[in-house]
Amino acid sequence: MTAIVDIAAREILDSRGNPTIEVDVTLEDGSQGRAAVPSGASTGAHEAVELRDGDKSRFGGKGVLKAVENVDRDIFDALSGLDAEDQVHIDQVMLELDGTPNKGRLGANAILGVSLAVAKAAAEASSLPLYRYVGGVQARVLPVPMMNIINGGAHADNPIDFQEFMILPVGAPNLKEAVRWGAEVFHVLKGALKKAGHNTNVGDEGGFAPNLPSAEASLEFIVKAITDAGFKPGEDIYLGLDCASTEFFKDGKYVYEGEGKTRNLEEQAAYLGKLVESFPIVTIEDGMSEDDWEGWKILTDLIGKKCQLVGDDLFVTNVSRLSQGISKGIANSILVKVNQIGSLTETLAAVDMAQRAGYTAVMSHRSGETEDSTIADLAVATNCGQIKTGSLARSDRLAKYNQLIRIEEELGSQAVYAGRAALKALA
């Protein structure tokens, strides 16, 4: 009854107006699953390959018709008749069919679209919500949202070198209230930026991109907005950074073009340590560049006990890179992006490896998103306790928050909001 009878892919548009792939999977009993694949702006060099057409006459070469064709032909031929409930086998068949270490032949976007759609179809056939189908009866922890409210770096056209400044409403009693707290801070911040003469248009992920001179200036604006919204910084709401340091790592140095400063490895670590001392920062993502293992070690030794250090470009949701990091004592958390690795099975394996090693895991969106809210379900399915899915603007971001609100409501008294317990630095 759960045999795959049809797989159909199409080219749709993401939140930046770029093409991406959407896949529908139909099972013998009529159950269907649909998944749309996201895309990143600042991508790690070690990520799985997103297959683009390269035909400059369509979408500036960004079309995904080759990936669509790979789904409709090769992948469908390989999966037709297989049991959708055997997710591990289905993903393995696709990996073997691709035959490359980085999914470069079929495309990680093609493989992931099918992988997620198969899981959704199987969940429907089982009459279970996706989070319950993937996570079982223990799936009940609602994640702390890491809300990106000021943007810089590759996500904005302003002098700020760091890519994201986030708020984490850990003190909220539940997920729904956490979202409300975040929204209220967001609106207070908007008013403050406007009053100070800054542009309040929003960027790719719904955050503001004001012309502020430094990271410190951005953090000061956010701390004041938290206070003015009636919350306590460092108690109700903490701060987080995504430095995306790979983007400004040049010739072994960290070059802050916006600030006109250059820092070596030790100075970069010391600078981040100073920010943690000066502001209620509880998590820093990609504080060092993706292959700067030495810098990562310096940073981890310096502040790893008091701050969550998240590897995104460093680990790229890849178990082999994560295991290297664990063995070297580098970072203490992994950012989990389904399209960095390209299949549900491998995504879950990365979360499992992190949790077994005592690392935290943060489920994450990409800057190019769609209305697909799968990652909300996966955050609950894995009980990872943290989700990063943008600001409190743009429906491609809100789709995930709204899905979490629905899941919390559905779980009722079983639901647990992760709160402070999600972050070991606060435990």
Curated annotation (Swiss-Prot):
Protein species of origin: Beijerinckia indica subsp. indica (strain ATCC 9039 / DSM 1715 / NCIMB 8712)
Binding-site residues, Mg(2+): 242, 285, 312
Spans traversing the lipid bilayer: none
Annotated cofactor note: Binds a second Mg(2+) ion via substrate during catalysis.
Gene (UniProt): eno
Protein name: Enolase
Cited PANTHER family: ENOLASE (PTHR11902:SF1)
GO biological process: glycolytic process
One Pfam family cited in the UniProt record for this chain: Enolase_C
